[in-house]
């Protein structure tokens, strides 16, 4: 058929100020004009001289042209990529999950050497000034403290008075800080309270109090706006040899700093009374330091316990009496803090130094602080620096095999290109894996590994250094050498922090340690987490589209998918029959997607089930608050009561909010379990992502447990009905994952693997959970609000009626 018009189509130009939609509307309106006698019609009126020349085309032909242009329109690349991933969700879920686990195992290989980012620190740039004179003064303090142990009467006040006297003799300002131990009891609002919130205990006994001794050196070159804190915990009731040594080390440095001319920041020496715990003493002092009370509590307290408020009555030394103050003394903003301890265990070969850095909820100090201590200890004082590691990892055969494989791959890579630095020795890989696992564990636990954790609540970078002598019993000469090396290390750290012009900010705050001199930054370890959780949204979208497509087929009286297709994989995918894929090849993408959303309201029932279960998880998390009110309750009894109340609360919620396991109106849907699984995976994905912001280590370990359980969840009834090797294997894997994924079972398995199964009891899980809520660890909320509900929903999918 010959075309109606042979004249070429003129180029269409948009009018100035016209949008494309308005121009299209004008063009369509023109097409509806009555038929003219001429073959072409143009506007030639004076008012339309600037309009383009538009040929007259019949409406039918114009409609055909419009459909052709629309059919050629393709979705955006990001939409096409999403459709492609959803259509192949089974393949990509396997690839991404395996890649996530592999990336986690590769972290020790990908670790980088530490370096100091802040140039102003300049560790080791100045020769140490600590001499034998300061060491001799420290030895006198150690001897005096040791002699007090033979005097049971008055030794508590005597040790405090002695330390205060030495501080005052060095020229520092001395004050005492009295505190009462707080009762650690579960309370749901404590998870959302700031560290400066306090409770005033009623009927406080004078016997239950501690007294911190505080000495402050005012910097001759400073303005009093910044300070460096040294902390030495000691038990005033019974000072042992190690505590006396730690006090001697700190005093040798403190007495030196009172005479140096270069000090630009105030120095605070906190002798923390650790008879109620090291953390409690430091936390109480920090709380009062940052949140002063303007009330009469101090007067009331002095009247209640007058003997504890006359600690500085030293008649024999008028200079000491003049330099001791009753009020709470303060210095400037804390730039950094260092907790100094002498370890109980002796090292066999050489003096060593252990660094503890983990604070509450996985918070870490700036990496520059650890690097400074490590550099000065290794390169200036010849100390062997160690960080904690999980000893059980050192004896794992599969880890050794994996390390040998990475070592061979490294040799092969260097044979191809000598510049490639992939691969490390197998022994180094095992050590790095054990250290990395320890770093992940303690960060995920959310419990501080020392009194330094109290400083992170106030955004102060702090670590605990535990110095371990080569032999436990030190002679005079050996003790002098030990005090000199340890004191010069602390002096070097103070010098470096004193050089800072601003707070630590150059280096990393989010990292994992594989050794004292190697770390994995957040940009590297987040790759493993992203790869691990990436299958959850893909498979959730695939399940939802597939289930909606099946429901649409049933509603239009089309044959339902075959049983073979339904049982082909636990991750239901739809590539050839997916509405999204067909929409990508046609002009009805938005229309088709809209129909799926509007016609598939079945997900609301699954959302209701998930909401009820997650609400139940929140109730379970609050039950320990009431269980703690029961007097004389053992951990085993408390755990049993917790389990019974959890089951009872689920039954009550079933009666009030309707059963989360009821069919409702979904009896016609053959893919109800798929929609429920889709909602479960979406909720688990959101929970893991939110937890990664609060505590990455908890999210990583939780993802290793939840992601396989969510991906593999499939009704056992369908697997048993098919009775093939693949379905039976899948059912067995689901049962194993379901058992191991239950939080108490997970705890028992991990504790048995690391410590042995001989001493495990049912009440151990309650004791572990109790330690989490006492320290306000977000891991406790994760277990109750994210992990437990996801586990219950996966178990429901396994036993779905289908």
Regions picked out by a protein language model, each given a short descriptive name:
Residues 60-115, 521-802:
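Alpha-helical transmembrane segments of integral membrane proteins
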Residues 442, 466-550, 788-801:
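His/Asp/Glu-rich mid-to-C-terminal helical/loop segments that flank catalytic regions of hydrolases
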Residues 10-12, 37-41, 47-50, 66-68, ...:
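Low-complexity, intrinsically disordered Ser/Thr/Pro- and acidic-rich segments
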Residues 314-320, 450, 517-519, 552-557:
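Short secondary-structure transition/capping segments
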Residues 1-59:
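Intrinsically disordered, low-complexity basic segments at termini and long loops, enriched
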């Amino acid at each position: 058929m010959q075309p109606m018009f042979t004249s070429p189509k003129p180029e269409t130009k948009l009018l100035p100020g016209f949008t494309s939609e308005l121009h299209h509307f004008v063009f369509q309106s023109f097409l509806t004009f009555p038929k003219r006698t001429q073959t072409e019609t143009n506007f030639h009126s004076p008012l339309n001289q600037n309009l383009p020349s538009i040929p007259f085309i019949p409406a039918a032909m114009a409609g055909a042209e419009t459909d052709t242009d629309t059919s050629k329109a393709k979705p955006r690349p990001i939409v096409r990529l999403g459709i492609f991933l959803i259509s192949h969700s089974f393949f990509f879920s396997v690839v991404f999950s395996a890649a996530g686990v592999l990336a986690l195992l590769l972290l020790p290989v990908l670790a980088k050497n530490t370096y100091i980012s802040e140039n102003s620190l300049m560790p080791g740039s100045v020769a140490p000034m600590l001499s034998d004179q300061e060491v001799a003064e420290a030895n006198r303090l150690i001897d005096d403290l040791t002699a007090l142990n033979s005097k049971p009467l008055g030794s508590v006040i005597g040790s405090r008075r002695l330390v205060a006297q030495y501080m005052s003799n060095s020229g520092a300002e001395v004050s005492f800080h009295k505190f009462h131990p707080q009762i650690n009891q579960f309370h749901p609002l404590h998870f959302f309270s700031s560290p400066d919130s306090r409770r005033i205990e009623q009927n406080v006994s004078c016997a239950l109090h501690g007294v911190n001794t505080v000495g402050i050196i005012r910097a001759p070159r400073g303005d009093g706006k910044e300070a460096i804190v040294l902390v030495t915990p000691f038990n005033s009731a019974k000072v042992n040899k190690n505590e006396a040594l730690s006090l001697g080390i700190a005093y040798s440095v403190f007495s030196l700093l009172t005479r140096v001319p270069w000090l630009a920041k105030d120095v605070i020496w906190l002798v923390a009374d650790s008879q109620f715990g090291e953390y409690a003493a430091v936390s109480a002092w920090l709380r009062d330091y940052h949140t002063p009370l303007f009330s009469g509590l101090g007067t009331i307290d002095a009247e209640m316990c007058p003997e504890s408020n006359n600690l500085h009555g030293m008649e024999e030394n008028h200079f000491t009496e003049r330099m001791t103050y009753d009020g709470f003394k303060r210095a400037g903003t804390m730039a950094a803090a260092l907790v100094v301890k002498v370890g109980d265990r002796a090292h066999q070969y050489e003096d060593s130094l252990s660094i503890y850095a983990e604070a509450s909820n996985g918070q870490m100090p700036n990496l520059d602080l650890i690097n400074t201590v490590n550099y000065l200890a290794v390169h200036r004082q010849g100390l062997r620096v160690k960080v904690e590691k999980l000893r059980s990892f050192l004896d794992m055969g599969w880890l050794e095999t994996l390390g040998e494989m990475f070592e061979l791959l490294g040799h092969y890579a260097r044979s191809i290109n000598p510049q490639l630095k992939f691969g490390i020795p197998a022994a180094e890989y095992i050590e790095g894996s054990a250290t990395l696992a320890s770093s992940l564990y303690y960060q995920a636990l959310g419990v501080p590994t020392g009194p330094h954790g109290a400083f992170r609540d106030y955004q102060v970078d702090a670590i605990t250094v535990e110095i371990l002598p080569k032999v436990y019993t030190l002679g005079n000469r050996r003790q002098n050498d030990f005090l000199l090396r340890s004191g010069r290390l602390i002096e070097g750290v103070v010098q470096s922090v004193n050089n800072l012009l601003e707070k630590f900010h150059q280096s990393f705050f989010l990292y994992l340690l594989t050794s004292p001199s190697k770390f994995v930054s957040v940009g590297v370890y987040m790759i493993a987490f992203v790869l691990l959780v990436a299958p959850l949204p893909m498979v959730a979208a695939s399940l939802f589209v597939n289930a909606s497509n099946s429901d649409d087929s049933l509603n239009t009286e089309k044959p339902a998918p075959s049983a073979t297709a339904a049982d082909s994989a636990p991750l239901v995918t739809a590539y050839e029959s997916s509405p999204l894929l067909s929409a990508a090849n046609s002009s009805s993408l938005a229309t088709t997607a809209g129909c799926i959303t509007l016609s598939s309201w079945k997900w609301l029932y699954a959302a209701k089930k998930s909401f009820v279960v997650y609400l139940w998880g929140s109730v379970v998390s609050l039950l320990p608050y009431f269980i703690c009110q029961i007097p004389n309750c053992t951990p085993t009894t408390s755990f049993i009561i917790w389990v019974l109340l959890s089951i009872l609360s689920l039954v009550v919620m079933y009666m009030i909010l309707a059963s989360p396991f009821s069919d409702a109106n979904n009896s016609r849907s053959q893919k109800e379990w798929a929609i429920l699984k889709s909602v479960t995976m979406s909720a688990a994905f959101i929970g893991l992502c939110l937890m990664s912001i609060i505590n990455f280590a908890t999210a990583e370990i939780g993802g290793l447990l939840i992601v396989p359980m969510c991906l593999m969840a499939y009704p056992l009834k369908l697997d048993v009905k098919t009775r093939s090797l693949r379905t039976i294997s899948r059912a067995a894997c689901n049962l194993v994952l379901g058992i191991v994924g239950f939080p108490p079972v997970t705890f028992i398995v991990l504790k048995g693997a690391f410590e042995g199964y001989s001493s495990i009891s049912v009440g151990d899980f309650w004791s572990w959970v109790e330690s989490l809520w006492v320290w306000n660890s977000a891991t406790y909320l994760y277990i109750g609000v994210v992990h437990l509900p996801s586990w219950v929903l996966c178990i429901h999918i396994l036993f779905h009626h289908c």
